[in-house]
Structures are given as C-alpha cells and as structure tokens.
Amino acid sequence: MFAIISAGIAPGIALLSYFYLKDQYDNEPVHMVLRSFFLGVVLVFPIMFIQYVLEKENVGGGSFFVSFLSSGFLEESLKWFILMISVYPHAHFDEHYDGIVYGASVSLGFATLENILYLIGHGVEHAFVRALLPVSCHALIGVIMGFYLGKARFSADKARVKWLTLSLVVPSLLHGSYDFILTALSNWIYYMLPFMVFLWWFGLRKAKKARSVNMMQV
C-alpha cells in the first residue's frame, strides 16, 4: 500500500513543484497552494457521485457525451468554480502567473487522489503510464485554465468576460478530447501521442507567456 500511495502522489507533487518554482519573483504562500491542492482532492468525491448518478440514470450516452460533458465539462467546471470562489478574488492573486500555480494546484490535487484510487484498483504497474497521461493532462489543463484566469484577473470588464469564458471552455474541450481519444478511438495511442505533445507545447507556452508578464511587472 505504501508503494501505491507513493507512486500515486509522486507525479502530482513533482509537477506542482515544477510550476510553483517557476514563479521566480513572488512565490505564492505555501498554505494557499496546499489549500488549493486539498480542495482539488476533495472535489473527487462530488464528481464521482454525480458521474455515478448520471450513469445509473442513463442520462446521455455514448462516448461523446461521457467524454465532453460527463467528464470534460463536469470536472473542469467544478475546478473552475473552486478557483473562482477560493482564489480568484484573493489578494494573493496579484500576478498573472499566480493563475498558473493555483490552476495546477487544484487540478493536481484532483489528479493525485484519482491516481491513487486507480492504482489501488488496478495495480502499481500502471503508475508510469498514469504519470505520463492522465496526471500530466490534468496538470497542463489546469495550467491553461489558470492562464486565462490570470488574463481575466488583470483585464478590463469587456475583456474579462472573454478570458473567463475561455478559462472554462478551452479546458473543457481539451479534457473532453483527451477522454474521447482514450475511450472512443481504436488504436488510441496513435492519436494520444500527438495530442499530448500538443498539450505540453500549449501548456508550457501559456506558462512562459504568464512568466513574461510577471517579468515586465518587476
């Protein structure tokens, strides 16, 4: 059990540390980052319950509905809601890159508990693939959500609406695409590899842009 928990936690902590330490000028308070991570952990339970009810009540159906609505939109909208009520209005959210840190924190909290539960059910031998695919996917989608929230936080009213909309729509579409590739396509690995390369490129590009804004503010 210790090996499973360690393998389940390690990729999330490693990715969170990476994005946290990239904030070179004004690191966020550790307690705020840990709180966001913990809120992501707690979020697993209501999402599991809602998905269970949707499945039992036969709401929707087919890979598209499950991927883009029951999984993608549901999970990302609740992460977005957590960020909006616990982080977005907070005084510590005072730089564009802060959105990256908090977005990654909530997403990786969710991904870490989900990863542990999966490894308990399927075995620690899946840990490496889990780290490369779902945990990384959650982290990068959280980064992208946080990027757009950072844009919204420091924009005028009209632009703010656009960035807030993108902060929910883009992560939901990316998450839905990941799930659809994984569950609906045969030979999914051939589609997943370029998708993950794109996701890493897109996420790291957004993180770099946010850091450059921070540098101009110093």
UniProtKB/Swiss-Prot annotation:
The keyword ATP-binding does not apply. GO terms for biological process: proteolysis; signal transduction. It is an enzyme of class 3 (hydrolase). It is found in: Cell membrane. Residues 24-30, 122-129, 204-218 are cytoplasmic. The record marks 23, 28, 95 as: Involved in sensing cell envelope stress. Disulfide bonds: none annotated. Disruption phenotype: Loss of expression of the SigW regulon. InterPro entries: Peptidase_PrsW_arch/bac, PrsW. It is a multi-pass membrane protein. The chain crosses the membrane at residues 1-23, 31-53, 99-121, 130-151, 181-203. NCBIfam families: intramemb_PrsW (NF033739). Involved in the degradation of anti-sigma-W factor RsiW. Responsible for Site-1 cleavage of the RsiW anti-sigma factor. This results, after two other proteolytic steps catalyzed by the RasP and ClpXP proteases, in the release of SigW and the transcription activation of the genes under the control of the sigma-W factor. Seems to be responsible for sensing antimicrobial peptides that damage the cell membrane and other agents that cause cell envelope stress. Therefore it is a protease governing regulated intramembrane proteolysis and resistance to antimicrobial peptides in B.subtilis. Belongs to the protease PrsW family. This is Protease PrsW. It comes from Bacillus subtilis (strain 168). The lineage of its organism: Bacteria, Bacillati, Bacillota, Bacilli, Bacillales.
